[in-house]
Swiss-Prot record:
GO terms for biological process: D-glucuronate catabolic process. Pathway: Carbohydrate metabolism; pentose and glucuronate interconversion. InterPro entries: Man_deHydtase, Xyl_isomerase-like_sf. This is Mannonate dehydratase. The gene is uxuA. It comes from Levilactobacillus brevis (strain ATCC 367 / BCRC 12310 / CIP 105137 / JCM 1170 / LMG 11437 / NCIMB 947 / NCTC 947). It catalyses: D-mannonate = 2-dehydro-3-deoxy-D-gluconate + H2O. Catalyzes the dehydration of D-mannonate. It holds the Pfam family UxuA. It comes from the Bacteria.
Length: 356
């Protein structure tokens, strides 16, 4: 296992590579090219420039998060083939730079949804939160909430150019149900997996966040049954998963350690997001929490134990952190709480290693 840290680049992140290098145990930077429009080819020279920048700081770059999927592919429009060809070339360019894992998602319109970016916790810290009653509002209300409370940062999946077309996107998805969305994912996988095999790259699909239908939009990676359906679409191990403990754990019916034990031995999990959440109601409302098991509703020790016992050898990163110690950065992506999360996860892993 290698510990990683998500970084938004020197132009988009208040955190510096030198800061990341000083977090004990971090070996990988999980990065991306954030200025390339969705659907366009990522230029090889820009990928290599990012790789060299990361390596100059004494870190590695083998995981990309994310190469986003154009909505025409998810909707299944005739224009999807052009965007799929671009995606295939991006895979080749990333592979040429040494990238081996590509995290992506297949969520319509919104990559993730929270109803509060600054939910106040009892200790004075702030965290991301989701309340189901809040999504009864119009999507535009949620968009305003995100835009007005992001501390001046652009959040992944909430880029202004996409949000400006949100009504057109809802109209375009009007005829897409869960069955059709799954068929469109199948079409996409059939086109890109041969390229992945040729280039020795593994795709790592991220779970729906939260794993429930929102605004009438379908979801197709919510639980173990969905994962089995996705495996059946294309049996190649290049068709892999990101296990996001928080996203899957947002459904209390999901047994995250059991999911890990099912798919890590299959060689389908190159990438893990480790995050804890705390349920606030029986309706599935939650806020994010510190990584420590006792601070949330997930057993982080059992999760790390499942990874250890199944021989997980991919990259793991702390997911969203709280805003603590007067930090005011990109919500969920500050330095301090994610660094604390890494220290905790590393401690669990060392204990598991020495007990083995």
């Amino acid at each position: 296992m290698e510990m990683g840290f998500r970084w938004y680049g020197s132009q988009n992140d208040q955190i510096h590579l030198a800061d990341i290098r000083q977090i004990p145990g971090v070996r990988q930077v999980v990065g991306a090219l954030f200025d390339i429009p969705v659907g366009e080819v990522w230029p090889e020279d820009q990928i290599i420039r990012l790789k060299h920048q990361i390596e100059a700081a004494g870190l590695k770059f083998t995981v990309v998060e994310s190469v986003n999927i154009h909505d025409d592919i998810k909707i299944g429009l005739p224009s999807r083939d052009r965007y799929i060809e671009n995606y295939q070339q991006t895979i080749r360019n990333l592979a040429a730079a040494g990238v081996r894992t590509i995290c992506y998602n297949f969520m319509p319109i919104f990559d993730w949804v929270r109803t509060n970016l600054h939910f106040s916790l009892a200790d004075g810290s702030q965290a991301l939160a989701f309340e189901h009653r809040q999504v009864q509002r119009q999507p535009q209300d949620i968009i305003h909430e995100i835009e007005n409370n992001a501390n001046g940062f652009v959040l992944p999946g909430w880029e202004p150019e996409r949000l400006a077309q949100v009504q057109q996107l809802f109209d375009a998805y009007a005829g897409v149900d869960e069955t059709q969305l799954a068929a469109n994912l199948n079409y996409f996988l059939d086109a890109i997996i041969p390229v992945c095999e040729e280039c020795h790259v593994q795709m790592a699909l991220h779970p729906d966040d939260p794993p429930r239908e929102l605004f009438g939009l379908p979801r197709i990676y919510k639980n173990l049954a969905d994962m089995n359906r996705i495996v059946a679409m294309n049996p190649s191990t290049a068709n892999g998963f990101t296990i996001c403990t928080g996203s899957l754990g947002e459904n209390p019916q999901n047994d995250v350690p059991a999911i890990i034990r099912e798919f890590v031995p299959q060689g389908r999990v190159p990438f893990v997001h480790a995050r804890n959440i705390k349920f606030m109601s029986d309706q599935g409302d939650f806020h994010e929490s510190a990584h420590l098991s006792s601070m949330g509703s997930l057993d982080m020790f059992a999760i790390m134990q499942a990874l250890h016992e199944t021989g997980f050898s991919g990259v793991i990163r702390p997911d969203h952190g709280r805003d603590i110690w007067h930090e005011s950065g990109r919500p969920g992506y500050g330095l301090y709480d994610r660094a604390l999360g890494i220290t905790y996860l590393n401690g669990l892993w060392e204990a598991l290693e020495k007990q083995a």
